[in-house]
């Protein structure tokens, strides 16, 4: 009875374990893989800080609009009291006693607050221009972030479909293994039957092919392990789930290659690098305008409040006599401020103008580089398309060749060498076709990226 219970328990645990493994294997599509990898990317988190810093500069510029300069100073300490020998004076008239002296036996806490503030009223639009320059700078930072993101998305595209390619190659090798086993059985049968048509030199060639085939299998196995480990890393797989691509077969993407001028025009309109340089140029130009306006006199509203209190130091009644240890005073008014560091401002303007020219030249250089990049990727994609088409035709021919050699061998008219050659060629072309499909998809993704076209359009198509 106990043995039955133990056996049932073991069976249940094994079944539960099998279910858990099945539940932990998750197949995800490219968009899910891409979004999760981007969310976990330390590189993207690092680049995002540049965007947040640029957005913080907008807040700093906007803060100059409302009371940009407010200051509070406090002073605290112990001070002695005062005493006077004149009995005809009230405490608030002690300033009239020329013989007034400190009372070192009477100590009290001294407290003083000084509050001052300045509010811009009219600055010729210098603050608004500074805010606009900061906003354009943040826009440039966002475009730079998008450019880095596009680079990472391209690498993730290759990584996702590398897994699909590895799965395809594994299946092809399994099919090839079945054919290798079939030929090996036939050779063994011929040996047992003492068939004189069996050429030992052909057997040696087959044994060599088997060894080479085992090397291929080992390479594929290690590549698969590498891809899986890389997937686990980019997806931050801390829950122990097994992630696999939802796409199980590697086929050419459905998008067609457009004329080259389509990608050139798209690149000039969509590339985030060009948008970042353009926004940076506008930001520099706006900043120069702000600097020029800062060189003009500005109208400000300023005010202050001073308060001091010391219990043993009475406040004096004469407004012209202030007791610095016991007072309450304040005021406000308009003021005109003019910066007199003209040489420094002029140097800043000249430096900004140099940066403005630099931004213009950078755009021209970037356009030249992008044009060459688009043309190069267009050439690679077009060539990859031809390779896929021709390899597919060659594979069809190799399948007919292998079928014919298999029939000849089965009827005793063929040779092992010819059958092995046909089988090797078919496997070689199958692997080559999948590799070239992967290269075609990758080259088309690079072409789209160089044109500023989102990679997700390839998957959608």
In which residue ranges do the predicted regions lie?
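Bacterial N-terminal signal peptides
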Residues: 8-17
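Alpha-helical hairpins and coiled-coil heptad-repeat segments
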Residues: 184-203, 400-420
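Sec/Tat signal peptide C-region and signal peptidase I cleavage site
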Residues: 18-22
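Amphipathic, heptad-repeat-like alpha-helical segments
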Residues: 42-49, 161-182, 210-224, 274, ...
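Periplasmic alpha-helical coiled-coil/stalk elements that build and connect Gram-negative outer-membrane
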Residues: 28-32, 149-266, 425-426, 443
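Acidic, low-complexity, intrinsically disordered peripheral segments
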Residues: 23, 78-82, 432-461
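Sec/SRP-type N-terminal targeting helices
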Residues: 45-49, 63, 121-149, 199-201, ...
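A small-residue-enriched
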Residues: 35-122, 154, 237, 264-347, ...
